[in-house]
Structure formats: structure tokens, C-alpha cells
Amino acid sequence: MRLTASAIAEQFGLTVVGDGTTEVSGVATLAHAGAGQLSFLSNPRYRPQLADTQAAVVVLRADDADAAKGTALVAKDPYTAFAKIAALFDVAPVREPGIHASAVIDPTAQVSPGAHVGPFVSIGARSRVGDGCVIGTGSIIGEDCVVDEGSELLARVTLVTRVRLGKRVRIHPGAVIGADGFGLAMDAGHWIKVPQLGGVVIGDDCEIGANTCIDRGALEDTVLEEDVRVDNLVQIAHNCRIGAHSAIAGCTGIAGSAKIGRYCLLGGHVGVVGHLEICDKVVITGKSVVRNSIHEPGEYSSGTPLTDNRTWRKNAARFKQLDVLARRILAVGKEKE
């Protein structure tokens, strides 16, 4: 597919600087783009690459347009504009409707004639797969699940039981949705299992990364509202609620019954203690541990910044002495009084 700069600008409301007839057939980074490819400049640190890039068209802000040596497309947010343009060239393989001969489907399950069910798929009792859905190779849909219109389970996705997916949900390989929550009670020195009788509800337009686990609720459902984006290797425990338009980076763990607001961003390897609440529009930076509820929007951190090992060891040794030092300072203050 080849598109002119003018056609792209018209489709996405951008401004052309230079030759609008310039054609592009793909996308790439500034450093590696070649003839006929489109790139973008969003981070100022890459501005020096404008002078050397071979990109036919660059998406950038108005104040960077003078530095572009070829055709430019001016956008208020170049990264978002690039994402929309790149989607034009991201041509997914066509999945024809139909059920592969190796699939095993319970007689009580309902599969739309417009759905694609791949090899070695299993669909359990009373589950429903909507129109335009793609159920990839080796995926398992357990009992009483719903996969709504246009949703896609890539290879080896497991919906254990009582999982309801909204429209246009995309789940990447290896994810497990609806497994038992980690509910245990101690009885006479032995653990007994607390039955997990709830389910999982995932709203429209959500995306779940590879090997992520979302447990079903004990009594009430675990809920992800619409347009939540979850990276790979994330654990969301039972009874959690994640607000709409929030994004969670890889290796994050969210303990049971935590409630996270709308438009929140959780960096990589964040830990969230259970039974707390985070309000809307909160950013938690990577490696932080959230131990208390957050009631004010803003950016929060508790991770330890990287430093050289020798300095870190000195700081760690001093950290263990903080209580002694604090007592000494307090004592000196009292002596001066």
C-alpha cells in the first residue's frame, strides 16, 4: 500500500509542510527509515537525527518543522499521530469465519457463524462466542464464558470459567483469565481453600498482555472497565477493580480487592497492597510499592534510583543506622535546651 502525505494529512487532520505528493509505503524509526518510509519525532533528544534521516515523511511538532529536510506532517502530538498512521500499515492476517475440525465445542455452547475458531480450541458448556471473534490456536474457553463481538484470543489463551469479555478485547498468548483467586483460611493449623464463586468482567477495547493472570473474584467479580491496557506478566488478584483508560506495565502485581481509578498509569514492577484505593489520574513510577490508599491525583514514587554499587552499599549501611542517628540528634537537641 502506498499513500501520499496529503492523503494521510487529510485523514488525520495534519498539516503538510513540503511536497504533499510524496508517497510512503511503510514506517520506521528516524535512524533506520529509508526511501518511501514515514517516521516521527516526539522526544526532543532525537531531534539531531532529523538532519540525517532518510525518511520520506516525518511527523513532528510545528516548532521542529524547519529542521526537517524533506516532507513533514505537523501534529500537536506526533506520537499519537504516528500510532494512527502506523495502524494503516499493520495489516493483520485474514481469519476466515469457521470452526477448525480439531476444535472441541460443547453442544450447549454458542459460536457465531462469523467467528473464527482455530485448531485445538476447546469451548465449554454454556459459553458464547460473538460475531467477528478470533479464537486462536490452542485457546481454552471454559464454562459460562462470553466473548463479545470482534474480540480476539491469540494462541493458548485460557478463560477458566465465568469470564465475560466485552467488544474488541484483545488477549495475547499465554494469558490466564478467571483462575481461582488466592483465598485461604487457617483452620486448626491447616489451610482450607475459600471457594472463588465470582467471575471476571473485562470491558470493551481492553488489551491483555502475554502470560498475564487475572483471577476471578471470591464473591463479587474482578472488573476491568473499558479501554484498560495491561502489559505482559502482570498479576491482578481477585476482586480488584481497574478503572477505565488505565494502563499497567509489565511485572506489576496488584493484590486482592484493590481499586484503581480511571486514567491511572502504573510503571513496571509496581506492587499494590490489597484492600486499598487509588483515585483517578495517578501515576505510579516503576518499582514502587503502594502500601496506602492515594486520594490526590499526581505522580508517586518509592523505588530506589540506580547508583554505582559502592555508593549503594554505603547508603544501605547508613540506612540501617538511621534510628540510632535520629536518637542521637534528638538527644543533642534536648541537651541544647
Curated annotation (Swiss-Prot):
CDD domains, per database record: LbH_LpxD
The active site is formed by H238
**Does Protease show up as a keyword for this record?**
no
Q: One of this protein's GO BP terms? A: lipid A biosynthetic process
Q: Which Gene3D superfamilies is this protein grouped with?
A: 1.20.5.170, Hexapeptide repeat proteins (2.160.10.10), MurE/MurF, N-terminal domain (3.40.1390.10)
List S-S links within the chain: none
What EC identifiers does the entry list?
2.3.1.191
Family of the protein in this entry: Belongs to the transferase hexapeptide repeat family. LpxD subfamily.
Q: Tell me the function of this protein.
A: Catalyzes the N-acylation of UDP-3-O-acylglucosamine using 3-hydroxyacyl-ACP as the acyl donor. Is involved in the biosynthesis of lipid A, a phosphorylated glycolipid that anchors the lipopolysaccharide to the outer membrane of the cell.
Q: Return the protein name.
A: UDP-3-O-acylglucosamine N-acyltransferase
Which species expresses this protein natively?
Answer: Xanthomonas euvesicatoria pv. vesicatoria (strain 85-10)
